[in-house]
From Swiss-Prot:
Gene3D superfamilies registered for this protein in UniProt: Divalent-metal-dependent TIM barrel enzymes
Organism: Bacillus anthracis
Free-text function comment from the UniProt entry: Endonuclease IV plays a role in DNA repair. It cleaves phosphodiester bonds at apurinic or apyrimidinic (AP) sites, generating a 3'-hydroxyl group and a 5'-terminal sugar phosphate.
Binding site for Zn(2+) 2: 146, 180, 215, 260
InterPro entries: AP_endonuc_2, AP_endonuc_F2_Zn_BS, Xyl_isomerase-like_sf, Xyl_isomerase-like_TIM-brl
Protein name per the record: Probable endonuclease 4
Record's keyword terms, sorted: DNA damage, DNA repair, Endonuclease, Hydrolase, Metal-binding, Nuclease, Zinc
An example Gene Ontology molecular-function term: phosphoric diester hydrolase activity
Amino acid sequence: MLKIGSHVSMSGKKMLLAASEEAVSYGATTFMIYTGAPQNTRRKPIEELNIEAGRKHMEQNGIEEIIVHAPYIINVGNTTKPETFQLGVDFLRMEIERTSALGVAKQIVLHPGAHVGAGADAGIQQIIKGLNEVLTPDQTVNIALETMAGKGTECGRSFEEIAKIIDGVKYNEKLSVCFDTCHTHDAGYDIVNNFDGVLNEFDKIVGIDRLQVLHINDSKNVRGAGKDRHENIGFGHIGYKALHHIVHHPQLTHVPKILETPYVGEDKKDKKPPYKLEIEMLKNGTFDEGLLEKIKAQ
């Protein structure tokens, strides 16, 4: 079974149940959530996440595994502000606890961090320090380090940087990787013409067994732009053919594929989610040039 879904919202009183219902309405077989707003530290207590009802709904609809994304505000790469580093460590610990409580997520996707001017090596050492403070040998979920585009002072812009972080961490069996197609393309890897070669390079440097999550996004920018701006499937510089190949890649059948493509529409207050139609299009193997108009008409 193709494990494909998108980012969905966990909100209101229904929380996990709402997320599962939204995913099912898109024809998804997996999904990704934030356990609270990605840009702040406000979190509902675990008891209010409506876990039991959400899990029951998932079970009824054949969804076995979901992904959690850590909030953007975590930056364990910060070497200049101890309070930012400490917030990242404390918050990541809390996210591990919350993700474990869900019982259906094995991976927490984490943007490794930004060195904020101290240089990549210093940032990587700080990320290693943070992960060593957080990870324990008995935790049940992995931290999936996301491949980054190289925007600003982001660490994790190359497979070598990801490998360096993993190698420095004591309990690194608790680390995996989230391969983001837009980020990897924007960082300079040729996933359009040579995805198999890129995957082979990843295997040599990091190890393909670590690749546990895929973020499937097209890109608004040319390869190597270092920008990180997602585009709808088939409407960017990566293109439908390459993304379809990645989604159906025989070496990655077990890996959940998560869409984070932009909502569609001119009116900011009335943008439509693209996921139902994008998932259908990735399943059926044919690019639909009229897709964006169909999304708007939903």
